């Protein structure tokens, strides 16, 4: 092989930087990926939804233990709002829809919302 038809690399590569040896130098390009925005899923207090139903919601849709769910439920009851979890947009949207759907099927006025984290 005389190299006269070779354009820089043994495989005839046409990319990279030639260092004068007749071979291309491999260059590494790092692609920076943007982290997805996160959203807080919040439960809002009302005077009608049973506390036990709120605990059930937290256990079922947010994978909380009975103790964690009870603590969050009491926080919602006392402060008016409580954090269920922080998720990507699609996951948060799904969880809000699941909570609202189950609450409506049980005829409870429970409100669940999502808001973007700063």
Curated annotation (Swiss-Prot):
Signal peptide: none annotated. Residues 1-24 are annotated as: Disordered. Gene3D superfamilies: 3.30.1390.10. Coiled coil: none annotated. Pfam families: ClpS (PF02617). GO terms for biological process: protein catabolic process; proteolysis. InterPro entries: ClpS, ClpS_core, Ribosomal_bL12_C/ClpS-like. It comes from the Bacteria. NCBIfam families: PRK00033.1-2 (NF000669), PRK00033.1-5 (NF000672). Binds to the N-terminal domain of the chaperone ClpA. Belongs to the ClpS family. Involved in the modulation of the specificity of the ClpAP-mediated ATP-dependent protein degradation. This is ATP-dependent Clp protease adapter protein ClpS. The lineage of its organism: Bacteria, Pseudomonadati, Pseudomonadota, Alphaproteobacteria, Hyphomonadales. The gene is clpS.
